[in-house]
């Protein structure tokens, strides 16, 4: 489960950019039509938001969870 303040990466299909963008979760909304909608801010202060399926948590400990 993704939480506010957590570091995540956002899929290029959502951003329209060439690579995954890393940012900090600034808002999580429970949308009755789309489900969980997540908003992040990256290091350039750009804000991206979309459905949960476009975001993956960043594992800062570099620990394999398999």
Regions found by a protein language model. Give the residues of each.
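Short coil-to-beta transition motif at edge beta-strands of beta-rich domains
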Residues: 1-14
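Short glycine/serine/proline-enriched coil/turn segments at secondary-structure junctions
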Residues: 15-18, 31-33
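Short beta-strand-centered aromatic/proline hotspots
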Residues: 19-29
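A generic structural motif
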Residues: 29-32, 44
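Short aromatic-glycine-enriched beta-strand elements
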Residues: 33-39
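Intrinsically disordered, low-complexity, charged/polar segments
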Residues: 40-66
């Amino acid at each position: 489960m993704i939480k506010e303040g957590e570091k995540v990466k956002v899929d290029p299909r959502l951003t329209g950019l060439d690579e995954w963008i890393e940012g900090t979760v600034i808002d999580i909304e429970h949308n009755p039509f789309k489900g969980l909608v997540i908003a992040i801010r990256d290091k350039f202060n750009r804000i991206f938001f979309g459905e949960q399926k476009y975001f993956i948590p960043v594992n800062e400990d570099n620990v394999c969870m398999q």
